[in-house]
Amino acid sequence: IRDYRGGGRSSGRETIGRVAAGAIASKILNELGISLCAYTKAIGPYVINETEYNYSEISQNSLYMPNNNIAEQAGQYITSLMKETNSCGGVIECIADGLPVGLGEPVFDKLDALLAQAVMSIGAVKGVEIGDGFQAASSVGSKNNDPFYVENGEVHKKTNHSGGTLGGMSDGSRLIVRAAVKPTSSIAIPQETINTAHENTEIVIHGRHDPVI
């Protein structure tokens, strides 16, 4: 049964099971010395650069952004979209510290691939980045490669453009994953569509729908 009022498999409400399972998984991982942190990096045109991060401010605003000033601007933007019955997208970033080296398989079950599959299975997610992601496409090898060095007998990286994975496996550095979320498709602005008789028509969606997921 598909409830036309919302709440079906394509609804954002489907994520409640993932949230519950994720909360439990986070506690288990914490016992293993692995810490997770996820937050909103961007809402519409309001993007927080890494140099502007303040992780202590994440829980201080309702948008879960690591910068209260930008969160306030993004909130005003969302309010304006609500008045226009429109919507916007955003970017979620997740970081994991304390991962052991070697998680993932080198071919079909690469850590990158498994993460991308899991994140892309979330409704409205249209893109996934690991590390520098799409920015790496405009870089050059000499800058994108992460230099290694040894300190006190341990191997480290000077940079982390790869986002914590190499050759499909975790390399012990911080894992960085981003998800691009499209604007909510259920809006009250008239849109062109077709009906069951294959006729051109318009649709206006009413009900409880969010201006951003």
Regions found by a protein language model. Name each.
Residues 64-73, 137, 162, 205-213:
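Unusually extended, aromatic-enriched hydrophobic runs near protein termini
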Residues 18, 24, 176-179, 213:
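Active-site scaffold segments
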Residues 2-107:
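Glycine-rich, mobile lid/loop segments that gate access to catalytic sites or pores
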Residues 1-8, 191-212:
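Short acidic, glycine/tyrosine-flanked loop/strand segments centered on an H-E-D-like triad
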Residues 85-88, 92-202:
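Glycine-rich anion/phosphate-binding loop at the beta-strand->alpha-helix junction
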